[in-house]
């Protein structure tokens, strides 16, 4: 990974030269938290004039910016575990044969100059779900070990102090080599005033009662996100409320049956996947994410941006940016009684107080452009570090 010049980043920008940078992630798509970061970061750097390539195994039809290129490494593999390892090996080979100035790893590889931890660690994920590590998890853990081995990187960016602590524990990454930059929110997309009409139309379309509190559960992977705990807590409420469930889940039928067994099926609306989360955050009175493991949780601050208070847990990295005026953070054991108490507290606050203004104000401090600039400056600092290392 030999750098193409010996000038500093600041001089590079003044001279109008491009930094040839690659972002590495197994999957490019327009859904998922890490994928959201990948697209926004690639777009931002392309707008800065950098030469941006996304190295991946699969990608969507269109890049996040017209000038962003794809390098697709999709060799033959058998099963998910083999696919992960083969991709990491293919990235290693491709990078060695290329002349990138900076390689930014987002996951699933060990060849990079700077690494971002956006999905936590496989070890802590398994522990949080109280499950043994599967073969895929063990392969992921091995890739993580190589990715964070001494000499494998110049610096690590973490999206929460929670994740930073986990990589220190699991992979012995020195504290001084970690920078924490919390996630961002697109405050233009997630703006209740802008989409108020669409949210009202959706509320009418799915026949929600405007006179009853609306709780929202939204996310992919219902077990980890805590849907059973949400349904149980909802069944304990002494108020007449509604629960909307949005997301992608292979075993959705099991959760519908669980709601039926609790006798709350008539108050629950299972919507399946919907790529308009901003509408749901806007129509809801409270967003509920009682997660068992969440390195950060984009949805928490997306909810705030739409003026909707949230409930999450000590297992969620987003707790680091929250305050009691806009949210409740319940214990790591995700006790349904504690969750029900928090839900009852927030049921009418959006209608009776100025909490929406407070939510929006907090979200604006995490606007996407502001946070991406912090990330960009950190990458430039690593690039300078790499240049200095090459000259010694």
Write out the residue ranges for each language-model feature.
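Short hydrophobic beta-strand element within catalytic cores of glycosyltransferases
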Residues: 309-312
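Nucleotide-activated donor-binding/catalytic signature segment of Leloir-type glycosyltransferases, i.e.
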Residues: 255-273
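Carbohydrate-associated surface elements
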Residues: 162, 184
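Short alpha-helical donor nucleotide-sugar binding micro-motif in glycosyltransferases
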Residues: 273-274, 280-284
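A conserved mid-protein helix/loop that constitutes part of the nucleotide-sugar donor-binding site
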Residues: 36-40, 213-236, 253
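Aromatic "clamp/platform" in nucleotide-sugar-dependent glycosyltransferases that forms part
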Residues: 292
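Glycosyltransferase donor-sugar binding loop
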Residues: 57-59, 185, 218-220, 242-255
